[in-house]
Each structure stands twice: as structure tokens, then as C-alpha cells.
Amino acid sequence: MSHTSRWTIADALKINESDPTTTMPLISTDFPTMDESVMIWDTGALRNIHGETVTFKGWHVIWSLAVDKIDLTNASIVEEWDTRNNRAYIGFWFSKTGNGADWQWGGRLLQTSADLRPHEWSGSLVMREDTANCVDMFYTSEADAPVNQSVPSVSTGHIFADETGVWFEGFSTSTEMFSADGIHEANSDEDEYFDFRDPHVFMNPEDGRVYAVYEGNVPGMRGDFTIGSKEQGLIPPGFEVGAGAEYGAAAIGIAVLDDGAYEAGDFSKSRWTQLEPLVTALGVNDQTERPHVVFRDGRVYLFTISHASTYSGGLVGPDGVYGFVSDDGLFGPYRPLNSSGLVLGNNQTQPLATYSHFVDPEGYVQSFINYIPDPTAADPSAYRIGATLAPTVRIALEGDRTFLSDVWNYGEIFAQGAWPVDPAPDKRPIVSESDSKIIE
């Protein structure tokens, strides 16, 4: 029996971009940046396998997709920002306070020897349960040629800290976790633009097993779908499904890890079983990026991000974070939060202001600044590129409804606990000049 829930056309018709309870705050054009030498976007906090943000020896730690600026004068920032995915790597930051004002850039997380493909895309950084300092970076190994390749993968290392900061060792190799199989989700043979990325790995409290949710597409040839009554939902009388709806085929996939594999640190392909998607958006949208779960008050909240530009069939919705809730465990059924699925969208006057929202177990939401309108008399369409973290906001979760409740500092994070480890400072390794060149 299928456990897949649907985000329907009727659900999406309920989206209200003018609702202040589901709208991100406006971003000032004079926003601060974290570091002028790098540009960052998708970001996540160091967490445990249960989804809680944790500190390590008193330090807050986050990872970010990043590129080094080529021109520090910002003369070419538009081109550099718009092509950033072609140079993306995973970097990290550390802070004593987590208040957003004192993030220190730590540099590259994975060694280049770990790269199975040229680009490192989004995922999750997770402390290994029952270890002192082992940490797994689940991420997307991506290449555009000779065909679109996007494979959830993992690299493992160790975290260290002293009075002055945080550093990592290891992360020298990567292991592929699973690939789009054309059965549970579309692969490159079915859809040359297929999405298969952003692994979020966690332990389900209900059965104690380790799962990964990820972005995918409904299996089948691109554009060759029939949008039937199940995909339409309870549409109003006379409503006609718009042209191109069959090109919206997003799915939130799920895979389960074999028992005992997590404890052994074995995340190889043979240890994962891909299951039917948790949610599909056939006829609605073609992207459900960075899916992640929150277990709260006996419910399972499933969040994802999407773009205005990936809606299909004439449907309209903002760039932002969307969500679904289940009262009956991880496998649902799920219903869209706020009836429509929209949790937080950009203000209509700043439609591209923020993106890649991530919701933590206490409802704090981090995102990055994308494009902020900054019109001048000479150029009314001028804008400022962000490439830094947006103000953190908080949402209240009340059953199947959400409400924007608080706005915090730029780049602020909140830990739900401290990783259980000897607080004594670690001894820094002595790195020779030749070793540093190899690492770089």
C-alpha cells in the first residue's frame, strides 16, 4: 500500500502571498555581511542524529555552500553570484555566541580528494551518536557533464576545538549513498533536468531507525504525465488545469538505512533501501529542495523550499519554505500546513530576498540573502546581492498552522544542547607548508 501523500493543485490555489503570518520580514539594503572574501548560500547548523542543533566544546558551528570571491572589489559580483553553483564547495563557520555578529570563517570542510565530482552541494552535518567527535557530512556530489549527475554522498571526519576556534580533520574520501533509480524517482534517462539531492539524515524516534529524506522527481518521462483528480484535489467548479502542469513533478524521497549500519559508519549503497516518496507535487511544482523533518508534539513536520519560478500550470507561489504535517508518524498521511503548504514566503516587494530556509526543532528558521532591490534614479531596477545569512526568524507551530512569531539577528542560531564531550581544549596539529598546500 502506498504511503505517498500529494500536494495538490487545490492546495496550491489557497496560497496567500499577502498573509503577514506567513511572510518573511523586509531586508534592509544596508544588511551586514559575514565575510567579504566569500559568498555563501545554503547553510545548516551542526546537529545530532535526532535533529537538534548542538554546540561543540562551547562553540556554535555551521556549514555553508560557498565560493571564494574572484574580484574582491565586487565589480563582477553579479556574474560570480549567478554562476556560483559551478564552483560550489562546503565551508564552515564557528562562533562563541551564535548571535550572528562574530562568525569566523573556517574555510573548506571537505578535502578536494573527497570530491567524486566537481561540485559539492547541499546536505547536513551530523555528529555521530556515541562518539566523542566523529562527524558525518551528508551532501550532494554533483556534475553537469557529460550528463546531469547528482548523487547523495557522505564524507566522514572529526571535529576539534580549543580556546581560539574550531577545526576539522579527515573528510578525505566520500561514499555514494544511493542514486536516482527511475523507479522511486526520475533519473536522467527520464528527465534530463531531474533533481536528486540535499540528503537530510535523521533517526526516527518512532522506530529508532535512520532515514534520509531528499529532493527528487516523480518517476516517468518528463512532461508525459496525466494530471488526474488525485493530483488536482478539490478544485473549484469550472477550474481548468493550466498548460504545462505536467512539467511540475517534484517529490520528497525517503530511504532507510539497514539496522546496524549507522553504528558501523557504513553508508554505502548496499545498506540503503529507497522507498516510495513521502510527498509528490505532480501538477503543482517541479522542485522541493532541502527537505527536512521536525518531530514536535507527537507530530511530524516535513519542510521543504521551492521557487516561484518552478510552479507549473500557471500556479503562483513565492520563493520560500513550505511544509506538511502528519499526525500518524513519518510515513503520513501528510496534509499541507496552513491549508496551502506555504509556511514563509518572501515579501511581494522583495520577491527574491531570501531562500533556502531551514527550520530547527524549536521553530527557528535560518536562510540566506539573495537579491535585495536597491533602486536608484539612474537604475530603478538595481539590486544588492546578499551572499550572506538573513535575519533568523521563528515560527510558532500549532497543529497544522504556523505563524511568524519573532525576528532575530542576522545569522543567529540557537542550540538545543551541547555535544557530550570532555570540554578540555584539543591540541592543534602542526601543519607544514607542504601539508597546507595539499589540503588547499
What are these language model-derived features?
Residues 1-440:
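Carbohydrate-active catalytic/glycan-binding domains of CAZyme proteins
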